[in-house]
Amino acid sequence: MTPQQKSAAHLPLLYNPFLNCIFNNPYYNKAPFKQTIEELARNHNDFTILVPPAHVLHHCYDPATELSSHKVLLRELCYNNEEFIRSHIIRTGTSYSSTITPISKVQSVIYNTMSGKQVLFKNGMVFMGKGFKRSLKLNVLSFQYFSSFCDYFPKGSKFMILYVEDCLIGSFDPHQHLSRIPQDDETSSQRSVSQQEVQDSITFEKLLRSFPLLSKAVSERFYRLFHHNNHQFRVLRINTRKKLEHIRIEFHSMLDEAYKIIQDSIKVENPDSEQTYNIINHILSIYPGLDLNRLVHDYVELNLYDKLWAQLLFQYNYPNDDKQSYDPEAVKFLTAETYNRLSCLALNQLDIPIFKPWQINTLQEKVALAIEEFSKLADSSIVNSTAKTKIIINTVNILSDLKSGSDFVMDADVLIGLLIMVIVHSKIDNLEAHLYYIKNFSAIDYSGDGHFNYIMSNLDAVLFHLSSSLSDELSDLIVHSQQNFEFWSAIQQGDVDAAKTMLDEVHENYVGKEIPSSHYLKSKNINGESCIMFAIKAKNFSIYDMLINEHPNWFSIDELLFDKNIITNQNLVMVALADECPEIATDLVNVILSSATKEEQVAYFNSVDNAGRSVGHYLFHNYKLMGILGDIIDWELKDLNSHTPLFSICRCYDHPNYPTLISEAFACVYQKYGGENINFDKHIDKSGNTLLHIILKNIPESQLLSRKENLISVNQQSSKYMTPLTLYVKYYRLENLKDLLQDNRLDFLLEDSKNCYNVFDYFGFSSMKSTIPNETFKKIESLIFGFYIDNFLPKVDCKKLFSLNAKYDQNKRDWFIFFRDSDGISNHKSLEMLKQIIYFIKLDNPCTYLPDKDVVWLNYGLGSTTPYFHKYRINRLIDTLNLFFTGLLYRNGNCYFERFLETGRDRERSTLDFIQEASLRQEKKRANLGVVKLKSSQIDEIEFFLTFAISDLYKYKDALHKFGKLSAIADMKQTDIRTVYLSALKKLVDREGNYTDELKSKVPVEAEIQDSCWGGFHSYVFWLQISLDELLKSVNKILEEIRTWKELYSSIRELNSELHQIEEKSPSNNNGGSLSRRSTFSIEPIPELDFEDDTTSAFFNFSNIIESKKARYKKLLMTKSEKVKQIMKLNVDIKWEHEVVASEISSFLKFRCDFLRFGVKTYVNSETKRIRNNSIELRKLLRDVKNNGKSYRK
């Protein structure tokens, strides 16, 4: 085993077997991993890993072995099956196919896996395609970067991983499989109901369309039967006076003719009879129990209804002068005038022996529902007897249906009284015609149906009561209706004098007596509204006061408690609050509190209307009542919009006393529940908005954040993926933003789980709006950027630069990164431009520990096709850029930051121009050193310093390498630990059967708990590593140059020695032709003795050279000249680079301390914040478990 394998083998195992086999595998260079690992290592940005949950891999089996005696766990496939591994790694560098729907903007992308299979991503789902044995659809739970810590992947590489809900090949759990018991009885029942529904939907017209041969056999004769030229049945087409019996006989004659058409089609005389007979038998076999006669009847009725109904209306609306003698059945009693005279008739005036208020309410509700159903008779779509009959039956069933536990009996008298109310108030015109049609034109013979006959007899009795035959009874009803009308009108019109006159009369007539239940004072309209309700709606306290306070004995407390609008289910206090009658509302509350028991008070004030709202939901109309009703109101009661009373109060944005409203409401809640018993999760609406989301201002008055007992999440996302922070920025809630930024639980840079938007993205969206409140916007801008500078950047004395967010430009097909400095100057650059700027910065600063440009772009491929998480990758690139800027701050980053804030003036210049300018600047710096002369001793000193420094740096590198690995794996292990912990907690909750599904759902799953803070700290460690690598690269470069210098120096010494020997042997030339190194190099001669001083100039001290060795001499001299030039250049390079590197080493020693200290500070802040938030979540779970246990024991 190689050292690398040993180091990898000793790292802790990851809880997820799939991740462990890829990133923590000591046998990575062996089958079945070798090829996969090599491909990932070559270009990790081109791949995305789909990771199944750990609990699935540990506990579920390969579905291919489901029927086998030897079942294979999925985790074993992770280590033994190459196909399994490669099927979960997709190539996202290039897509097979990509489409986008213009309207919904839903993007679908097809990718290939490493094994050549295909998967489709669409709308947050992944679908198995070509190559997979099973067609599965899996949810994408989350996505994130995985920091590699092994040696066989590039240092600092991060892999994109997607958590999916299951393996791509599927899985099965034998324990769950055994627990699934098929519900045969239920399935059979559902199938029976389904067949009955299909059979009921069949019509004769559908059969004719579905079976052309049947249509061919009968359609022509039916056409002739219904044709307007058919004189045999012309009676139905002529609007003349005739008896109803004649119409009925004519219809049945046509019906008999229709039956005859069917019978004739199967007679032997008909050549197609056998074929038609077989078709009919086939239809009956498909739909067993089908009544063909009923279908034919309905078909005839469908074709004749308009004519039949027109005939009936003509007869019933004919003047009643002689109808009693001509045709008594055609008399019309219920005219528009009769309906109008009875329009204010009340239920209590029909001699119904029911007096308890709650029973009356029940009957009122039944009547209202029955009227709604009965009114359908007037609908033009009701065109047959079946539909009419169904309406009649449903109406009576509504009236007759008694709830379990009901304490009164529905006898015939009560039913007739209720039917009178239904008929009078539904005001169906030509009701007699409808009833005649039902009795005489029905497809079903109801003569033996007792229930139906009972219904019709009751309807006949009602018509009898409302006819002129009983003039006294009808007159009484009309009188009651008129009295109600006059009394209610006086109240509704605010006529206090008229109302007082009528009430004084009542007082005089019933002094010391009980007012009869049938009196108009006790009457209620069809909506169940009493005279008290009318007074409240009229906002007339005087009339209300006369009814309630001047005559307190007229209405019992039960009558007040059950006085409500049965349509809206709003009681008296609700209406008083909703209609903003504070005086009446206060008096009503005092009357109820003084007269009702505690149980009655709780039941009354927490009863709900049709919108699910109680009195508490309306208290914002009169917040002064909160102090009185605070202990009675159920503040956690939700309406149909999932708004609690407290939530509704927080949404009263237009309330003139909003601060007081908030203060009073929360004070009541804290007083009633106290401690940690307040469950703020119960105050979340359907859209996932918490109280923090919805509150407009005055957070300090609410104590939501300041009260230590409040278990509230300040980072909770709504269903629109907005946190309170992003919502405050989007809707300019400046006051709330100030308060929230002071909370130490706030995750300022939290990204939403769908679009990866953070607070800067929402600020960017707001800045693009055309109408922005200028001053407020500027203050918000100052707040959020000031907060970022104070909390996410080191406190150094120089300008600070940071990147905010990114936007994709469709036209330029590139992302643009937005920047801002601490002075408020902002700019944006494309990714291509950024790449050049970072490259130029490094080019301008060689031999420094600034990371290379490739490191910044290590985990971001510019050409990668990753539509589902491209924003996530851009955000991580922004994190890297901010880390880069943070590193520059410790180098006085002002000179570097200017490039990022430059406008477009440099865009016309080419990359080559920048490179040439950088080279010229470097040459100029070297030229400023002048002639550099380095002695061997100086070189030795430089070498000694660098050797000592590099030794120390390598030791630090080894420690940093280990630290980097530990911080990387700690990122995953911390998440693993919490995953296992919460998994155990979930099992504990599941094992106790008394816990609700809502409570079980609060335990997170693996993909929801990637909240380790070690990943952020690892980035700082990695940045130190790459900075140190750059510094070591520069030191090694100088040491290599020193080695080259020494080699050149040794070569020159040898050349100098040989030249010296030649000069000594050369005779003197009297005519001035002696060889001289002075004339060759044009430098000052250096004495021979100084040669041993090891200076470069000593090489140019030449003596006389003999003429015969001149050629040899020149050759050596040229060689030496080249080497001297090289060593002179090295002198400049070594001196300049040594000065730079020495400065960089000194700077790095300070940088590594400050930078790592800031990294530790950032980690500690993040970790303490995480611990605070996790502590709140666990305390909430513990509270819910305790409360759930208490409820179960009760």
Curated annotation (Swiss-Prot):
One example GO MF annotation: guanyl-nucleotide exchange factor activity
Gene Ontology cellular-component terms listed: early endosome; late endosome; plasma membrane; transport vesicle; tubular endosome
Transmembrane annotation, as ranges: none
GO aspect biological process, one term: early endosome to late endosome transport
Domain VPS9: from-to ranges: 324-475
Family recorded in the similarity comment: Belongs to the UPF0507 family.
PANTHER family cross-referenced by the UniProt entry: ANKYRIN REPEAT DOMAIN-CONTAINING PROTEIN 27, DOMAIN PROTEIN, PUTATIVE (AFU_ORTHOLOGUE AFUA_1G09870)-RELATED
Full protein name: UPF0507 protein PICST_55861
Species per Swiss-Prot/TrEMBL record: Scheffersomyces stipitis (strain ATCC 58785 / CBS 6054 / NBRC 10063 / NRRL Y-11545)
